[in-house]
Amino acid sequence: MYYGHEPHDWGTSSSTSDMKECTICEAPSNGYHFNAASCSACAAFFRRTVTLNRNFVCTHQNTCRVNYAMRVICRACRYHKCINMGMERSAVQPRRDCNAGRRKIMYNSTNSLKTQEHTFAPPTPTVPQTTTVIVTKDERIYEDSSPEIHYAQSYSSSISEEISSLSPKISVSMCSGTDITLNFEAEQVLEDLLREERLFNERRKLLYCSNSCISELLTNENANEIPYSQSNLQPLTFAGIQKHIRPQILVIYEWLRGWRHFELLNIKDKSVFLRRCVLYHTILDPSYLSYRLGLPEKFVMFNGMYVGVQDGDKTGWEDEKDCITADLKIKLYRPLMDRLINEVCVSMKVINLTFVEFVLLKALVCFKSSTTCEVSVPLKKFMNTYMDTILRALNVHYQTLGMTKEDIAQRIGNVILMMSSIFAVGMECLESHQKIQFFDLWQLDDLLIKLIQRGGGGANY
């Protein structure tokens, strides 16, 4: 567990070690999967393709570009590149036969009707010998989606109450085939979240790295982990924060739109979800950047600006004429920064939080915080099911790393334990900024005020 009180070494950690490049999609990778240097996303794609025995046909003469930053990747070209780069179908474990899934559950005729009212019997999984899918660049098909996902795609202006039947579907796994299907869905969720985080980082890099040359902006080095390098960091000015708040809200909104069910939500649910994402991105992104780049000397904000952490270091805490005084800066934000460092950044360092863990932690926090607010009941149920899938994705990720069940349980527990501290800091952040707005202590962005003045106080964590 991470709640010890021993001194913390903020030197280079394993999470910052050199990363090899995935030979398929060019994303950073630190290992081999199926005998080829690849990232976990390409490994998951190859495993699904082989296990389900799928064939893809490219409509563009197999010349499509395959890159991790693309929203839609041609699956035919991606599979061919996996083979060309050395991945072996024989290295994938064959799909286990699921006899239990084919057995019918027998009930007494007198009780069958009552049983059917309360018991969900999962359909027998049927897998054709070969499935051919025509793939174009302009379409995005989730062939491995579960019944929950198919239902969500038919979600209109409000979710039907039928979604209440989704919750039991995860818990009634009756055969290994069902487990395999759920694992495929979890891998797809992980792939989606990793892709959106990479795009999120690339957008921030283009928006905020004003001193970088074009070649530096376009490089893919470490792009899926942190958007900045030490040379990009600049002393913080509150005027700069004012200028960059709205672009940051925009890139958070784009991250949110990457969730494939977001456009199916009604306006009220979208609004609540956006508020929670803005709040917790504002907490988690600086914490992770500081853990990776800044501490123990610097606390790095979302835009690459930093303030001094050590006593006596006035960097970023100076007076700013016509904006905010040094005393007000320290009074309003120094306690919040200290709490973030001690309760979030230190925890990240102690457990040596990896990029994949950070991505899934951020998704869990955003979804969980939304379910504690006034979202519709059907959406709340669906989000709870989706969080189960995120946790399953984390478990599958650990399994691909060869971790034991005991290590996996401890690791997941450490990640989940971080959430309570993050929620507590979130509530303090809301209260602090509501006071700033109420007493007009300094000028906040109007859109930010609208996002934090509602939906923040009624959450119970």
Curated annotation (Swiss-Prot):
The keyword Zinc-finger is annotated on this UniProt entry: yes
Pfam families for the chain: Hormone_recep, zf-C4
GO CC terms, sorted: nucleus
Family annotation (CDD domains): NR_DBD_HNF4A, NR_LBD
Record PROSITE patterns: NR_LBD (PS51843), NUCLEAR_REC_DBD_1 (PS00031), NUCLEAR_REC_DBD_2 (PS51030)
Keyword Transcription: yes
DNA-binding region: 19-94
Major subcellular location class: nucleus
ZnF start-end (NR C4-type): 22-42, 58-77
PANTHER family the UniProt entry points to: NUCLEAR HORMONE RECEPTOR FAMILY MEMBER NHR-20 (PTHR46397:SF5), NUCLEAR HORMONE RECEPTOR FAMILY-RELATED (PTHR46397)
Function: Orphan nuclear receptor.
Protein name: Nuclear hormone receptor family member nhr-121
Source organism phylogeny: Eukaryota, Metazoa, Ecdysozoa, Nematoda, Chromadorea
Encoding gene per record: nhr-121
